[in-house]
Amino acid sequence: MTHQTHAYHMVNPSPWPLTGALSALLMTSGLIMWFHFNSTILLMLGLTTNMLTMYQWWRDVIRESTFQGHHTPNVQKGLRYGMILFIISEVLFFTGFFWAFYHSSLAPTPELGGCWPPTGIHPLNPLEVPLLNTSVLLASGVSITWAHHSLMEGNRNHMLQALFITIALGVYFTLLQASEYYEAPFTISDGVYGSTFFVATGFHGLHVIIGSTFLIVCFFRQLKFHFTSNHHFGFEAAAWYWHFVDVVWLFLYVSIYWWGS
């Protein structure tokens, strides 16, 4: 903050947006190579560069916020607005998937047999793994709230316990989802039902993995005493994101698994 007459953070030039964009290009190109040519080399390269970019960018943000004091109240306010806008954009992203699902299911075309689920599709039982997944995510919503309140009260041990439980539940959800995909009696290529089901639930699963990664970073930061009861926006943003993931799943469960079956 030396030689500065304002409370805002002037970010130094960083290579990570460029490497992040390149890793995204490599991953999307790698997916095409994997789908069409059964080659995972480009995809693995993209994932590796993405992981390296995430690690180093997160490291820089932690340095700037925790050790250099750049995250003043004004900067934190801007970050909060940014996170809110990001979550709104994610809501609109998922709105597109729900629109596709309801557009197809509320007025099934003759090609689908005039019914929903389409003729020949055997949907998953919503009272089996999907209901367990719902319980797991709802429980994780409770534990992340417990972690947040413990942090605000300065109870470090309870915060760590609650955060660990949330991460464990997030990983468990991902494993359950993977087993459900493996055992599903239909695939992404089974018409509009398969494509809307796997794209909507798959993108939600990706968001759970991203949210779990965010929480794991917060867990290690808390182990190193990075958060205080009044300076913990990194954790707060992760908690907001996790609640968003939780709410989206409830809509997915009610729409696609329960009503759609």
UniProtKB/Swiss-Prot annotation:
Bilayer-spanning residue ranges: 16-34, 41-66, 73-105, 129-152, 156-183, 191-223, 233-256
UniProt record similarity statement: Belongs to the cytochrome c oxidase subunit 3 family.
Gene Ontology CC terms: mitochondrial inner membrane; respiratory chain complex IV
Its job: Component of the cytochrome c oxidase, the last enzyme in the mitochondrial electron transport chain which drives oxidative phosphorylation. The respiratory chain contains 3 multisubunit complexes succinate dehydrogenase (complex II, CII), ubiquinol-cytochrome c oxidoreductase (cytochrome b-c1 complex, complex III, CIII) and cytochrome c oxidase (complex IV, CIV), that cooperate to transfer electrons derived from NADH and succinate to molecular oxygen, creating an electrochemical gradient over the inner membrane that drives transmembrane transport and the ATP synthase.
Stored InterPro entries: Cyt_c/ubiquinol_Oxase_su3 (IPR024791), Cyt_c_oxase_su3_dom (IPR033945), Cyt_c_oxidase-like_su3 (IPR000298), Cyt_c_oxidase_su3-like_sf (IPR035973), Cyt_c_oxidase_su3_a-hlx (IPR013833)
Keywords: Membrane, Mitochondrion, Mitochondrion inner membrane, Translocase, Transmembrane, Transmembrane helix
Membrane-side (Mitochondrial intermembrane) residue stretches: 35-40, 106-128, 184-190, 257-261
Molecular function GO labels: cytochrome-c oxidase activity
Subunit comment: Component of the cytochrome c oxidase (complex IV, CIV), a multisubunit enzyme composed of 14 subunits. The complex is composed of a catalytic core of 3 subunits MT-CO1, MT-CO2 and MT-CO3, encoded in the mitochondrial DNA, and 11 supernumerary subunits COX4I, COX5A, COX5B, COX6A, COX6B, COX6C, COX7A, COX7B, COX7C, COX8 and NDUFA4, which are encoded in the nuclear genome.
EC number: 7.1.1.9
GO BP annotations, alphabetical order: mitochondrial electron transport, cytochrome c to oxygen; respiratory chain complex IV assembly
Domain of life: Eukaryota
Keyword Disulfide bond: no
Protein location: Mitochondrion inner membrane
Enzyme class: translocase
Gene: MT-CO3
Entry keyword annotation includes Amino-acid biosynthesis: no
Pfam families assigned: COX3 (PF00510)
Protein's name in the database: Cytochrome c oxidase subunit 3
Mitochondrial matrix membrane side: 1-15, 67-72, 153-155, 224-232
Membrane topology: Multi-pass membrane protein
Reactions this protein catalyses: 4 Fe(II)-[cytochrome c] + O2 + 8 H(+)(in) = 4 Fe(III)-[cytochrome c] + 2 H2O + 4 H(+)(out)
